[in-house]
């Protein structure tokens, strides 16, 4: 069955269990064919760091989520690394696999790959995907393998999608990330970039400098409560889904690797304490582009100042200095606020910086063990139903007023 699915390029599956590595941080041979060897790093260590350094030196852009630095600041997560090596040509591709526990079925795990797409050759990209499918199928307790594809090149997305279908993946029923986004071209100088923005966007950026606010980076210790409050307030206004982030990890990464991560905030100069922070924006540098995973802000009484314009401009300038080619706003809808799109307001805001809207993402899932996957889905659905019923009962129960008179 597996050999039939992998008919695109003849391959040789590893026979029997993989031999134990001499050191926990050394890679294991996961996959091999006549042209490529695929290694699996299950632990951090100098071997993985050296592998990543070789990829970067060869010109391969590694998204931040695939880097050792990301794994270091997220010590509670299991982040493996898959490295593809071409015979006589060195490393050609690499990506991290997030291994998380299933809440529906204890003892089982889920594999997830973010921002898959970067590679020095199509063959290396394909070998990595074959190895990933083999990894999922070779371990009985893997319920699902999720691949988030990111590529501005439509041809790459199509080739990846075709291969994933041949490997048994299906287009994800529920989206976790974005398909379309707004891109700002960072080729011009700063004045040239600014000139491409809408007039109202440029005006809103300048307004901040005329008022009692300042833009500066947010350092450790992270003001976790304030960041969550600002993000929650923004999501409540737009109707966006809940977003949970490890802000201590974000600030640790920003302090440790300021060229990879930047958490910038807008602070009132006439206030002190946590409430002085009125907005924030986070940027991640993936090599050839920077994206904006999260932004949050509050609204002040009697103030119409658009806080986040200055923060996005700060991230764009940082991206330009870091050598990125594009700034990615992290998703956009095609609707507008006036049309009733709940996310239309934020999408209109993003389009004020650029009219370049492109498709970049696709999502695919594989259930290596379909029966276990169906059971997990049924258990998850039943758990959600019970939780909804309990909340409904709790809301219907009369509440006795115990406050003092």
List each model region and its residues:
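Active-site/acyl-donor-binding loops of N-acyltransferases
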Residues: 2-45, 99-105, 164-191, 325-405
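A conserved beta-strand-loop-helix scaffold within acyl/acetyltransferase catalytic domains
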Residues: 27-105, 151-153, 166-175, 179, ...
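Aromatic (often tryptophan-rich) hydrophobic motifs at membrane interfaces
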Residues: 108, 126-137, 260-370
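The substrate-binding groove and active-site-proximal loops of carbohydrate-active enzymes
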Residues: 114-120, 302
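Short strand-loop junctions, especially beta-strand C-caps/beta-turns
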Residues: 116-118, 147-150, 218, 295-297, ...
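Acidic-and-aromatic substrate-binding clefts and catalytic sites of carbohydrate-active enzymes
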Residues: 120-123, 151-156, 223, 335-342
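Non-catalytic accessory segments adjacent to catalytic cores
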Residues: 123-181
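A structural signal for short, well-ordered beta-strand segments and their strand-loop junctions
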Residues: 143-148, 216-219, 265, 326-329
């Amino acid at each position: 069955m597996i050999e039939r699915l992998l008919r695109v390029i003849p391959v040789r599956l590893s026979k029997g269990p993989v031999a134990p590595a001499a050191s926990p941080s050394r890679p294991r041979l996961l996959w091999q064919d006549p042209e490529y060897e695929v290694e699996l790093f299950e632990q951090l260590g100098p071997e993985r760091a050296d592998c990543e350094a070789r990829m970067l030196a060869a010109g391969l852009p590694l998204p931040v989520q695939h880097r050792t630095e990301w794994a270091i600041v997220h010590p509670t997560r299991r982040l493996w690394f898959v490295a593809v090596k071409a015979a006589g040509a060195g490393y050609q591709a690499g990506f991290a696999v997030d291994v998380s526990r299933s809440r529906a079925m204890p003892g089982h795990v889920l594999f997830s790959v973010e921002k898959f797409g970067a590679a020095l050759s199509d063959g290396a990209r394909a070998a990595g995907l074959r190895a990933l499918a083999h990894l999922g199928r070779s371990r009985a307790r893997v319920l699902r393998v999720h691949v988030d594809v990111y590529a501005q090149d439509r041809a790459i997305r199509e080739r990846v999608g075709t291969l994933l279908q041949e490997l048994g993946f299906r287009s994800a029923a529920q989206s976790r990330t974005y398909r379309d986004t707004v891109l700002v071209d960072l080729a011009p100088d700063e004045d040239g970039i600014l000139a491409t923005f809408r007039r109202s966007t440029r005006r809103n950026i300048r307004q901040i400098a005329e008022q009692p606010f300042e833009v500066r980076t947010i350092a450790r210790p992270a003001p976790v409560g304030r960041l969550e409050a600002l993000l929650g307030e923004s999501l409540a206004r737009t109707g966006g889904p809940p977003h949970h982030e490890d802000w201590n990890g974000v600030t640790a990464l920003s302090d440790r690797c300021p060229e990879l991560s930047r958490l910038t905030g807008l602070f009132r100069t006439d206030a002190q304490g946590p409430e002085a922070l009125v907005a924030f924006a986070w940027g991640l540098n993936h090599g050839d582009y920077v994206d904006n995973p999260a932004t949050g802000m509050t609204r002040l009484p009697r103030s119409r100042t658009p806080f986040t314009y200055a923060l996005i401009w700060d991230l764009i300038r940082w991206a330009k200095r870091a050598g990125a080619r594009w700034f990615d706003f992290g998703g956009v809808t095609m609707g507008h606020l006036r049309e009733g799109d709940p996310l239309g307001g934020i999408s209109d805001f993003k389009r004020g910086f650029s009219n370049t809207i492109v498709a970049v993402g696709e999502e695919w899932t594989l259930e290596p063990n379909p029966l276990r996957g169906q059971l997990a889905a049924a258990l998850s659905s039943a758990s959600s139903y019970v939780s909804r019923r309990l909340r409904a009962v709790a809301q219907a129960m009369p509440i006795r007023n115990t406050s003092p008179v």
